A protein has these predicted regions:
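Phosphate-binding/switch loop-helix module in NTP-utilizing enzymes
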Residues: 75-105
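The conserved Walker
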Residues: 11
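Conserved C-terminal guanine-recognition region of P-loop GTPase G domains, centered on the G4
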Residues: 101-118
């Protein structure tokens, strides 16, 4: 059974550190883990002009570039895609999905609070 949890909170509250350490611990214990991180619109960079980006720009729904060790995946999302639908479409074969952000989703959440935000 897949387990999905979202980690939300203000910047510098420990979300990324927690997700990274959970990923390490779960992976070391034999679990498969996917991490989905919400970022600001327009902040993602990809290699324009490279073949994988060209395929994506010309309409491929999914474009994967791989060097044999690491892969980069570009996916066109539908309007309103949330982590639940992204998970259903692409992350179906992992034990844990750790989501950083997506505070408005209906996913179970771990909420990080800093002294300044209390």
């Amino acid at each position: 059974m897949q387990r999905v949890i979202s980690f939300i909170g203000p910047k510098n509250s420990g979300k990324t550190t927690t997700v990274s350490e959970l990923t390490r611990g779960l992976s070391m214990n034999g679990f498969s883990v996917a991490v989905l991180k919400h970022v600001e619109k327009g902040s993602l960079e990809y290699n324009k002009g490279k073949d994988s980006a060209k395929h994506f720009e010309h309409g491929a729904q999914l474009s994967i570039a791989s060097d044999g060790e690491i892969s980069s995946i570009l996916v066109h999302l539908k309007d309103g895609d949330d982590p639940g639908s992204i998970n259903e479409r692409f992350l179906f074969n992992v034990d844990f999905v750790l989501v950083e952000g997506y505070s408005k989703s209906r996913l179970p959440k771990a909420i990080f609070i800093t002294g300044a935000s209390v």
